[in-house]
Amino acid sequence: MTRNVTLLTFVLLTASPILAQVLSSTDAATKLRALFDEDWQWVLQQYPEAATMLGDNRFNDRLTDYSTEAIERRKAHERDMLDRIQKINRSELKGQDVISYDLFLQDKKLNVDGLRFPTEYMPIDQMNGVQIGFGQLVGSTPFRSAKDYDAYIARLSAFPAQIDQLIA
């Protein structure tokens, strides 16, 4: 009996730190993946045309909001994501999660640093802008049901407002 208690005590004492480290690592990895998912869903929602081109049809009835308020929300989101990724303890991550962490952190640093250059004042150039993207969007838009057509009509109807936002 004493031998069993001694063995159990030894197992618990050695397993506790290992288990705590595994749980901590899993917690950091879980937080990291949740942050990635939250950011990705935000991007798809903020840029519905991109979502459509990627095959995500949840936002096919919308266009990107270029209002001053929306632009400020996107800037705040980038700052928030940078702050939140830095709160995840990188040393608790392993393997691919470390690489993903580093890439995401670098991306968010570049995005926040780039906010110094207000690209919203030049939304159209010879390579990019609604004058090009809107016409190309139809090639990625599904037209399999009446709902698909209704979504596209809603998008067409929103186009003048989007142009007004870009002019403002």
Task: Please provide the spans of the model-predicted regions.
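Non-catalytic accessory/assembly modules
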Residues: 22-168
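Generic anion/oxyanion-binding catalytic loop in active/binding sites
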Residues: 9, 21
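Bacterial N-terminal signal peptides that target proteins for export
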Residues: 1-8
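N-terminal signal peptide c-region/cleavage motif recognized by signal peptidases
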Residues: 15-17
